[in-house]
């Protein structure tokens, strides 16, 4: 074999070995996500589709659940490595009961996506009309639950909180009169509002205590954090890179449209509805307010101590 031919063969072999090594280096992470199709909760899915997590040596296996409390339980049990978009009140309450979980990042600051609505034919037209009515939230301990409790407290309502599961299931229950007031999260249901089928009564921005604090978090379990800290660091970096990409590249909207199956007119509005700064992951905002709301909502009997907070908040950078 000539030297030129040998060089060509060796180069080809190097490419094959390099490709295999790249494939071998992809580390699996199991991630639980609530409310399939949501913009903010879709970071892991979109980053996976856009190749960003792969660039950081990660291959995500994604499980969709109804709401954050389910994903927290999956992380506690060890069947999932990470839970994203879990309600911070549920995370705090679960930790306070001794669960081996750690918060690794903020997922949403404020609640610009959250809203409550009634069918267009309903006599409910303002927040005060919630009195004596059943008002939906997903699952106990979710961010929609904590948000509703804060709304009730702020406006001194006698509303009846009612668990309705997913946003899609809630729409069905609200439109058929099984519950008086539904909850939603943008961009879900906005097409119904534009078509005049539902009336949005209030949003998360109407709840003062939610405006500047973290409402949802990403978390893992102690075992995963201790044994795979470098992996969690790479996850956080890929996650942050994905958020930046979602707000800068039209390709992200294309992926989101395919993922969410939402009408194009809604997909195009999504980045205006949820500002990029609300999805900052490197800090948990409003700790004092988080503690106050968690106590008021009976998620914890008393605020966590500084030592407990130091143990719970483990934002790997």
Please place each PLM-identified region on the residue numbering.
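Short, solvent-exposed loop/beta-turn-alpha elements that line the ligand-binding surface or hinge
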Residues: 55, 206-211, 276-285
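Sec/Tat signal peptide C-region and signal peptidase I cleavage site
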Residues: 19-25
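Secondary-structure end/capping motifs
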Residues: 225-300
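Pocket-lining segment of extracytoplasmic ligand-binding domains
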Residues: 168-256
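Conserved C-terminal helix/tail region of periplasmic/extracytoplasmic solute-binding proteins
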Residues: 292-317
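Bacterial N-terminal signal peptides
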Residues: 7-18
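N-terminal secretory signal peptides that target proteins for export/translocation
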Residues: 1-3
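Short, glycine-/small- and polar/acidic-enriched structural segments
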Residues: 26-164, 173-176, 180-186, 197-203, ...
